[in-house]
From Swiss-Prot:
Residue ranges constituting the RRM domain according to the UniProt record: 209-287
KW Transit peptide (keyword) present: no
GO CC, alphabetical: eukaryotic 43S preinitiation complex; eukaryotic 48S preinitiation complex; eukaryotic translation initiation factor 3 complex
HAMAP family referenced in this protein's UniProt entry, alphabetically: eIF3g
InterPro entries per the UniProt record, alphabetical: eIF3_g, eIF3g_N, eIF3G_RRM, Nucleotide-bd_a/b_plait_sf, RBD_domain_sf, RRM_dom
Gene Ontology biological process terms in this record: formation of cytoplasmic translation initiation complex
Disordered: annotated span: 1-31, 151-199
Protein name: Eukaryotic translation initiation factor 3 subunit G
GO function terms (MF aspect): RNA binding; translation initiation factor activity
Family that this chain belongs to: Belongs to the eIF-3 subunit G family.
Species of the source: Coccidioides immitis (strain RS) (Valley fever fungus)
Length: 289
């Protein structure tokens, strides 16, 4: 009896169960509104038959491109990209943003000078081939920012002690200890105690190209002012004074340009310009002391 049972079990194992044959075929129905209904069947993890209905709408998007661009896209690929599908491949091509190149006014003359210098002295790569990194503090072969003596020594080209003469006491930096090349000078007191010149110079350039705009409407916005003055040059900063409680403009603003010439042109054109039923008064901001 057990022998018959084993044979029956083997017979059941040998028979293959075809899931695809037991499922109804896929159905595609075209609707009057232009859509298609796709009906498919499958078995889930529990072995139950599941019916899936999807409605698909096909949309055709037409894009008008330059004929020359379309012609270049149809060119056959070569090299490692040979026999690949048209268009950029994601594994070999990275599509970036479109950068607008704006050459300077005298870019042709500059290009000729660079080309001439390159022909006489060789390319830039050849000039820098044998150059090594040199620290400005200890003259070592490392970057100045990584110098271990940057907090205790002054750069080689900077005077660290008195140089002699009648005004020796006046020229000696305050806080300097000892004399000679090994004297310690705090970073803030180097170059005769003028540690803040670079920061002041940056703000001074900013003030020279800053316009003060008065008689501004209470409904004015910084974005509108930036668009209005941005026609004359690159605007680096727009400050519109507003009331903290009402968030309304107080009537004046400051516009900073990257170039003073652009600021002068904007001052000439925008002084007396009508904006939101008011006449703007534009002038250069006074230098702070």
């Amino acid at each position: 009896m057990s022998r018959l049972a084993n044979s029956a079990g083997d017979w059941a194992d040998d028979e293959e169960f075809d899931e695809a044959a037991s499922l109804p075929p896929q159905q595609v129905i075209s609707n009057k509104d232009g859509t298609k209904t796709v009906i498919t069947y499958r078995f889930n993890d529990d072995g139950k038959k599941v019916k899936t209905t999807r409605r698909i709408r096909t949309t055709v998007v037409k894009e008008h491109v330059n004929p020359r661009v379309a012609e270049r896209k149809a060119w056959a690929k070569f090299g490692l990209e040979k026999d690949h599908a048209p268009g950029p491949s994601l594994d070999t091509t990275s599509v970036g943003e479109n950068i607008i190149f704006r050459p300077s006014v005298n870019w042709k003359a500059q290009a000729k000078e660079v080309e001439k210098a390159g022909g006489e002295k060789g390319g830039l790569k050849d000039q820098l081939k044998d150059k090594k990194v040199k620290c400005r503090i200890c003259s070592g072969e490392h970057f100045t920012a990584r110098c271990p003596f940057k907090d205790t020594m002054a750069p080689v080209d900077e005077p660290t002690g008195p140089t002699g003469g009648d005004n020796e006491d006046e020229e000696r930096p305050a806080g300097a200890l000892g004399s000679g090349a090994t004297a310690y000078v705090p970073p803030a007191l180097r170059k005769g105690g003028s540690g803040g010149e670079k920061m002041a110079g940056r703000y001074e350039r900013d003030e020279l190209a800053t316009l003060r705009v008065t008689n501004v409407s209470e409904l004015a916005e910084e974005g509108e002012l930036r668009d209005m003055f941005g026609r004359f040059g690159h605007v680096t900063r727009v400050f519109l004074a507003k009331d903290k409680e009402t968030n309304m403009a107080k009537g004046f603003a400051f516009i900073s340009f990257a170039d003073r010439a652009d600021a002068a042109r904007a001052c000439e054109k925008m002084d007396g310009f009508g904006y939101r039923h008011l006449i703007l008064r534009v002038e250069f901001a006074k230098k702070t002391t």
